[in-house]
A protein has these predicted regions:
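Cell-envelope/extracellular polymer assembly enzymes that use nucleotide-activated donors
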Residues: 3-6, 36, 41, 177
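Membrane-embedded multi-pass helical conduit in multi-pass membrane proteins
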Residues: 245-318
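N-proximal low-complexity "stem/linker" segments adjacent to membrane-targeting elements
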Residues: 1-27
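Glycine-rich, basic loop-to-helix element that forms the pyrophosphate-binding segment
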Residues: 68-85, 145-149
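Conserved donor NDP-sugar-binding/catalytic core segment of glycosyltransferases
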Residues: 98-131, 200
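Catalytic donor/gating beta->alpha subdomain of glycosyltransferases that bind UDP-sugars
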Residues: 170, 176-231
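Acidic donor-binding segment of Leloir-type glycosyltransferases
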Residues: 23-67
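Short aromatic/hydrophobic "clamp" motif used to bind/position activated sugar donors
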Residues: 90
Length: 323
């Protein structure tokens, strides 16, 4: 049965978060018969299947569960979802998001029957007065121009660009890639600030900033595909301070071996100044409680090495000159 809107949600083994998202979709001020929800699990996931089945039995949502045969990432999950969807419009959100009750109604009222159009809604990230570094970074989604936590495309628009690029295997840069390909094809992206999705920050363990660095490899892929757009909208130049910090560490060790004390102290001093600036930047808008400060200091020592490693790994993997 054809629908006005299909909501596609990628997920994997996060039933409690998914449950809250589905509760908000069940509260939509939009005719229940006019939209469907497609939950796509990034790999076999019995507990997610049971969650979706329980919702289906309530009759509060027209909802389907689709599992990928193996873990392939959210881009692949979204592709599976929209290709199985019956909606004229495909709305994307995430399992840790809470769509506003007027979300779908706002989207449909903005749609004028165009075959090729996309919409970008507004993201709200609730924060405590002094957030952690991780919380502050997530809050930058509020400034993003186009994110998959709250975006909509017509089926024809998605089909014209073949959906998401599944080489983006983690939740990183696949939304910018979709945006850039829409722009490349001349498909308009309309800002829709009245279409609101709240994105609470989920709990993260100690040192999450270290694990996040792996995503940097996909910067190289996006840069290879869209060098001009990448430099215009993502990052104008490499993070040279990280490279200088690593160089200083190498010079310091070499100077110690050569017993060049002045050179060693100079390299150590430059490294310490750059490290201090990096720590200051991360603490400028975040919590100053000692456990958080300790985490910031320790992870700031390691982040430059991990960031450069994963950026260069991506450059080699995707065969592009990228720093």
């Amino acid at each position: 049965m054809e629908k006005k809107i299909s909501v596609v949600i990628p997920t994997y083994c996060r039933p409690l978060l998914l449950m809250e998202c589905l509760k908000m979709l069940a509260r939509q001020k939009f005719n229940r018969e006019d939209f469907e929800v497609i939950v796509v699990s990034d790999g076999p996931d019995l507990i997610t299947k049971q969650t979706v089945v329980s919702w289906k039995h309530t009759g509060l949502l027209d909802i389907e569960y689709i599992p990928l045969e193996r873990k392939r990432g959210p881009a692949a999950a979204r592709n599976m979802g929209w290709r199985m969807a019956a909606g004229t419009l495909i709305a994307f959100t995430d399992d840790d998001c809470l769509p506003d009750p007027l979300w779908l109604q706002t989207i449909w009222e903005a749609y004028q029957g165009e075959e090729m159009i996309a919409y970008s809604g507004r993201i709200i990230v609730p924060l405590p007065l002094r957030p952690t570094d991780y919380e502050w970074n997530i809050a930058q989604l509020e400034k993003a121009r186009f994110v998959t936590a709250n975006c909509v495309c017509t089926r024809k628009a998605l089909g014209s660009i073949d959906g998401f690029d599944e080489r983006f295997e983690l939740a990183w840069r696949e939304d910018s890639d979709l945006e850039f390909r829409l722009l490349q094809q001349g498909i308009p992206i309309q800002q829709l600030p009245e279409a609101i999705v709240v994105h609470p920050v989920r709990e993260a363990g100690w040192g999450v900033s270290l694990r996040e660095q792996k995503k940097s490899m996909f910067n190289a892929l996006l840069y290879k595909k869209f060098p001009r757009l990448y430099r215009s909208y993502i990052r104008q130049q490499p993070n040279w301070s990280f490279y200088v910090m690593i160089l200083c560490c190498g010079v310091f060790l070499a100077a110690l071996l050569l017993e060049a004390g002045t050179l060693a102290l100079t390299a150590l001093g430059i490294w310490a100044l750059l490290l201090g600036a990096f720590i200051w930047k991360r603490l400028a808008h975040t919590s100053h409680e000692w456990p958080h400060v300790t985490e910031i200091v320790l992870t700031s020592v390691l982040i430059p090495f991990l960031s450069v490693y994963w950026n260069l790994y991506g450059a080699v993997r995707y065969k592009v000159l990228y720093l």
